[in-house]
Amino acid sequence: MKILSIHDLATIRKRAEHNLSLREESNEKVTEKCYGLASGAQHLQILICGGTGCKASSSQGITDNLLKAIKKNEITDKVEVITVGCFGFCEKGPIVKIIPDNTFYTQVTPEDAEEIINEHIIGGRRIERLLYVDPKTEHTVSDSKHMDFYRKQLRIALRNCGFIDPENIEEYIAREGYFALADCLLNKKPTDVIDIIKRSGLRGRGGGGFPTGLKWEFANKQQSDVKYVVCNADEGDPGAFMDRSIMEGDPHSIVEAMCVCGYSIGSTKGLVYIRAEYPLAINRLKTAIIQAREYGLLGDHILGTDFSFDIEIRYGAGAFVCGEETALIHSMEGKRGEPTLKPPFPAESGYLGKPTNVNNVETLANIPIILTKGADWFATIGTERSKGTKVFALAGKINNVGLIEVPMGTTLREVIYEIGGGIKGGKKFKAVQTGGPSGGCLTEKHLDTPIDFDNLLSAGSMMGSGGMLVMDEDDCMVSVARFYLDFTVEESCGKCTPCRIGNKRLLELLNKITEGKGTEKDLDTLATLGQVIKDTALCGLGQTSPNPVLSTLDNFYDEYMEHVRDKTCRSKQCKSLLTYTISPERCIGCHLCAKNCPADAISGLVRKPHVIAPDKCIKCGMCMARCKFNAILVC
């Protein structure tokens, strides 16, 4: 059906609202009651996470088996199985949610499907073993509203993820989808829209935090026959999956936001730049674009107006540097993904030399709801200079790994210990890396820092796109700095000397230190060279690449000193600094370690304690892996 007016859009919303009403109603209430057909339930819905993580853990197999069991029990008219986007609680996936009682089943397997149908759907009895167990109380929790992981979250950018079928445009419309676009086209001038975005205080969520409305205003003021809207979906930070999850769970919000941006700046063409290794996000986005065209929400004369806009997808090869907007534009043009000096900014001369507005996925996901609920509503959330919420990919040595969205101003302590559930295994918190390879490592003294753009910069890190990696007492901070710098060196485009050569020298120094060959002078060189690279590199990648080194030097200088002065690694992560010995009290002389040593470094008589020759030992750890008596000691 082609939507030609706001009336047509409202008609579809009314029709689709019925399908979502059960989810909407259950979302507003908290109940301990379990609903099943035997207890009088007339209709039930089973929501299954269809994000990449859960799909990799056989969520499609769960769907298939549920459908088989539903058909077998002849209840197809009473039970729906719906694939939705990421629920966020990736640590406990695959996740299955039963509506209307909001039962939240975790770590479900395809083999559990028949039991879910027989026990819960038909019998009205929850399956206790599939419920989440609160680690603090050790009690099961059936409803996500009672879980610490969700309690302090505020889902704005993720509002539809885990709630609607991302491949059903009518479910998106039922959640006020495309009404922001309709209101803009029918009731607002482009400058009115830009003014709302400016007043909301929305800043770019891709790393730099530049005011979104101001960016749109620059592009709007350019005089040109052709302008472009670009969605930067080239999310490349290690461990980051915020943008990918939004595209997988709510692709229509990106399509709608790009249309709104096109109207605001005077563009008729949108381009999504996405890495080819995100097949699910690509497929969901393709489906959304096709559906929007079929419904008349993309193409010529949208909603019967003079405004025309369409979207194409362009694929990247996974280069981290192409997250920088000028490098991204060059890649889309078929050139090497290398950044260029600014000015000119893309708003003046971007794709094919035309004015171009570039926003990342999360930034765009906020646009429709800001226009629907108003700039003042959005501006009340967050801090004075950082409005709204931020999506983070919480990973590392933390109990609750997953995707979270919290208001700006939430502290690191709240994120790590309340939402994240604390450190795995009860170990001691050591550091948290925010901002991915471009960010820094923050310590316990920073835990009460309210998270926003300015506070993280002041603390020696940055917001970045939203990666948040938690480390415990077993992590070596020199090795962490080396890991991130190794990534940056690999991903450098090589255009400017500070990044191409300077970062290689930094990496060589870190390798030297972790191999036990470093000196105290090397630490001074790390600090000096790192600052030079920050000051002189061409683009954001190079300018921020020394951050992990400089922040760990600032916060863990004693650990660096142990590596260069004492030639020890307290975390036992740097192999070259380890010494393997055999405990004569524990060794029974079974000779198993000697048989498996690839360097013939272990000697001894059978049934007598063995010894390791330190000059021959290559520190591979094979002896420790084979010893059954814990006789191998490492110091």
PLM region spans:
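Iron-sulfur cluster-binding cysteine motifs and their immediate structural context
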Residues: 92-96, 498-504, 592-609, 622-635
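Accessory "access/gating" subregions that flank catalytic or transport cores
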Residues: 182-223, 378-380, 385, 393, ...
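Flexible inter-domain linker/hinge segments
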Residues: 27, 131-199, 352, 359-374
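Conserved phosphate/anionic-ligand binding catalytic regions in large, soluble enzymes, centered on
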Residues: 50-58, 197-219, 318-330, 336, ...
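Hydrophobic alpha-helical positions that pack around
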Residues: 149-153, 282-408, 420
